[in-house]
């Protein structure tokens, strides 16, 4: 289940996607890849804070491998193409009240896969882009690719 280390939930749609500082994250049905991974890292809280950067690098490598697109990483949680956002990453810590220590880390990522400009709407279109827009065609959503 999701409660175990390395558990992952993947969704084709989010109804309440959110980013940092409670901002909303536009997540239309079957247009993106939305996922959450639970980790129970050993080590200090300081080391766990690096997980957001490590997640950004993992998304960067996956997108490069699958599409050939080299994204830019905006420290520490966003990936961009031509100065427009392709992916947002949110990391949250769960705390145990009794011990005052964190029990797990949940890393969520939302990747814009097949939206076009009209899908984003007038407010989001100037600042967001999908992999399909960057490629000029919708990427293959099957795994393994090819």
Show which residues each predicted segment covers:
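Residue-level signal for inorganic ion chemistry
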Residues: 35, 78, 110
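Intrinsically disordered, low-complexity boundary segments flanking structured domains
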Residues: 20-25, 76-77, 117-120
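General beta-strand structural signal in soluble alpha/beta enzymes
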Residues: 11, 71-75
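N-terminal lobe of the biotin/lipoate ligase/transferase fold
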Residues: 1-66, 87
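Long, positively charged amphipathic alpha-helical accessory segments at protein N-termini or as interdomain linkers
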Residues: 45-46, 50-71, 81-146
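Acidic, glycine-rich active-site loops and adjacent beta-strand->loop/helix elements
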Residues: 15, 77-79
């Amino acid at each position: 289940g999701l409660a175990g280390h390395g558990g992952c939930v993947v969704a084709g749609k989010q109804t309440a996607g959110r980013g940092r500082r409670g901002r909303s994250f536009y997540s239309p049905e079957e247009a993106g890849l939305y996922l959450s991974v639970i980790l129970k890292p050993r080590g200090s809280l300081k080391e766990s804070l690096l997980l957001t950067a490590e997640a950004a690098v993992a998304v960067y490598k996956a997108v490069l491998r699958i599409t050939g697109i080299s994204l830019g990483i905006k420290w520490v949680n966003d990936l961009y193409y031509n100065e427009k956002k392709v992916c947002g990453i949110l990391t949250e810590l769960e705390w145990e009240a009794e011990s005052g220590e964190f029990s797990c880390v949940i890393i969520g990522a939302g990747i814009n896969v097949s939206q076009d400009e009209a899908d984003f709407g007038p407010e989001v279109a100037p600042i967001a882009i999908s992999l399909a827009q960057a490629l000029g065609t919708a990427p293959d959503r099957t795994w393994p690719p090819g």
